[in-house]
Swiss-Prot record:
A divalent metal cation binds at residues 31, 66-67, 135. It comes from Yersinia pestis. One of its GO terms (cellular component) is cytoplasm. It comes from the Bacteria. Its EC number is 3.1.3.89. Homodimer. This is 5'-deoxynucleotidase YPO2559. It catalyses: a 2'-deoxyribonucleoside 5'-phosphate + H2O = a 2'-deoxyribonucleoside + phosphate. The record marks 16 as: Appears to be important in orienting the phosphate for catalysis. Residues 28-140 form the HD domain.
């Protein structure tokens, strides 16, 4: 018997942004799906508009599993995780142990297939960068949603993420930011108007 998927099912019980007041709580499971949507889109944009040659479906899978180890470690708040390089380095080691523990829950004949999704060492540098871009973009989108709902708790997080996005800047991310991001600050009525025309 394997407990792998029973563990992954519990990602929905782990809330993100645990130290901040949220208008709407976000869990790791739904965050992972949104990161998969965005990473997939970034890969397609890169391929279609900027001469990329990425496997968009693989990118979506990598993004889906990118926080899977948090079912064991929990979601450590960013200010703590990156407080200093030593803490960040040690936390990476903890994540690695958690990833290995998850992989060992699988039947032997499936372990390699999932190791390629759970362990960043199997990602190309380009795949890793794209998933990190999508992860940061989704955190930024969460900030926009919270701010548009009147929650000023996310002002500093938004400013920090804008710096992160500037560091991770790419043509495909610029395209995504210009074409898709503005809608996240609008109401349902506003985003529905264009759809009905």
């Amino acid at each position: 018997m394997s407990h792998f998927f029973a563990h992954l099912s519990r990602l929905k019980l782990i809330n993100r942004w645990p130290l901040m007041r949220n208008v709407r709580t976000e869990n790791v499971s739904e965050h992972s799906l949104q990161v998969a949507f965005v990473a997939h889109a970034l890969a397609i944009i890169k391929n279609r508009k900027f001469n990329g040659n990425l496997n968009a479906e693989r990118i979506a899978l990598l993004a889906m599993y990118h926080d899977a180890s948090e079912v064991i470690t929990g979601d450590l708040p960013t200010p703590i995780k990156y407080h200093n390089p030593k803490i960040a380095h040690e936390y990476k080691k903890i994540e690695k142990v958690a990833q290995q523990k998850l992989i060992e829950m699988l039947p032997k004949e499936l372990q390699h297939d999932f190791r390629c999704l759970l362990d960043e060492h199997y990602y190309s540098e380009e795949e890793k960068a794209l998933v990190k871009q999508a992860d940061a973009l989704c955190a930024y989108l969460k900030c926009l949603e919270e701010l548009s709902a009147g929650n000023n708790e996310f002002i500093q997080a938004k400013a920090r993420l804008e710096k992160t996005l500037a560091i991770r800047q790419s043509p495909e991310m610029d395209y995504f930011m210009a074409v898709f991001v503005p809608s996240f600050s609008l109401s349902l009525d506003e985003i529905s108007l264009d759809s009905l025309d």
